[in-house]
Amino acid sequence: MSVENVERLSPEQADAFFGQSSVDLISRALGGQVLGCSDDFFASCENLINPADPIRKAGVFVETGAWYDGWETRRHNTAPCDWVIVKLGPSSGRVTGCEIDTTFFNGNHAPEVSVEAAFLPEGNPDAKTNWTPILPKLPCGPTQRHIYRFKEIPQQNFTHVRLCMYPDGGIARFRLYGNVVPVFPADLDARLDLAHMYLGGLVVQCSDQHFGKKDNLLLPGRGVNMGDGWETARSREKGHVDWVIVKLGARGYIDDALIDTNHFKGNYPKEVILEAIDSPDHIPGPDAQWVTILPARKLGPHMEHVFTNLQNNSTPMTHVRMIIIPDGGVKRLRIYGRRAAN
């Protein structure tokens, strides 16, 4: 891939663009795994895929030197570069961009970086692996987010990615933005979580995500603490509601829903409403005709709420809107149903 095919985005531009269209395919929260690296003497390469923002502990030292929240290698590397290999969390994905974050690395940051990817559905990379360049070798400055959008999206699916830094140094976080390529069962009657990220579900819009990101709603598992759910700011005006829109991984018939308030004990929503729509748009417009599939229901703290036999389940849907009343936090949203024939 050439430099001309890469556009650098500001953090604000990136959050707006990728926030509506992509997920971080290598996030540990989505199942990403670091398989190996050339060296991580000063700071572990495992830190690269931590979904949390990097932090600083000024003045804190460990056995190898100053503590850093990221990946840091030895000085004086005699090889052309240091590298790390990461396996995507989902079965495979299409890549739309990437981020190399050097926050708090200043004077020990990686001077240059590049990214390559491979499709290996049956195994892991070895010395014979044919890597495809997706980010050309580019300068990498200190303590900043380097975020790139690919103007022409590679048409291959990828399962693994390799980040190289030249010749050595430190990087806080590595994000690989893109879309999950789902693998569906042949049986259309198979019961699926149509909203799950592994099946291509995507949170495309929300009213607010002050304390917890909207994308957390569709992650696997039930999370580890209150920080890995979706949580909005406290509302002060009468009649306020918050909402989130999910684009399903496949158009389908919605039978049941699960709304999990795990870890939200004093800040869960009072009530929830679910609406759905069959729309060709990525994000349904302001005049979209949503239909209710779950009228207002009370929620409780720190528990899974299962709602069965939802309304309008004979109509195929593409999107679900969850409305929480008046505000609060939800850990996970599951939308169970069956794929439509088309």
Swiss-Prot record:
<keyword id="KW-0659">Purine metabolism</keyword>
<dbReference type="GO" id="GO:0005829">
    <property type="term" value="C:cytosol"/>
</dbReference>
<dbReference type="Pfam" id="PF03561">
    <property type="entry name" value="Allantoicase"/>
</dbReference>
<dbReference type="GO" id="GO:0000050">
    <property type="term" value="P:urea cycle"/>
</dbReference>
<dbReference type="GO" id="GO:0005634">
    <property type="term" value="C:nucleus"/>
</dbReference>
<dbReference type="InterPro" id="IPR005164">
    <property type="entry name" value="Allantoicase"/>
</dbReference>
<keyword id="KW-0378">Hydrolase</keyword>
<dbReference type="GO" id="GO:0006144">
    <property type="term" value="P:purine nucleobase metabolic process"/>
</dbReference>
<comment type="pathway">
    <text>Nitrogen metabolism; (S)-allantoin degradation; (S)-ureidoglycolate from allantoate (aminidohydrolase route): step 1/1.</text>
</comment>
<protein>
    <recommendedName>
        <fullName>Probable allantoicase</fullName>
        <ecNumber>3.5.3.4</ecNumber>
    </recommendedName>
</protein>
<comment type="function">
    <text>Utilization of purines as secondary nitrogen sources, when primary sources are limiting.</text>
</comment>
<dbReference type="InterPro" id="IPR015908">
    <property type="entry name" value="Allantoicase_dom"/>
</dbReference>
<dbReference type="InterPro" id="IPR008979">
    <property type="entry name" value="Galactose-bd-like_sf"/>
</dbReference>
<comment type="similarity">
    <text>Belongs to the allantoicase family.</text>
</comment>
<dbReference type="GO" id="GO:0000256">
    <property type="term" value="P:allantoin catabolic process"/>
</dbReference>
<dbReference type="GO" id="GO:0004037">
    <property type="term" value="F:allantoicase activity"/>
</dbReference>
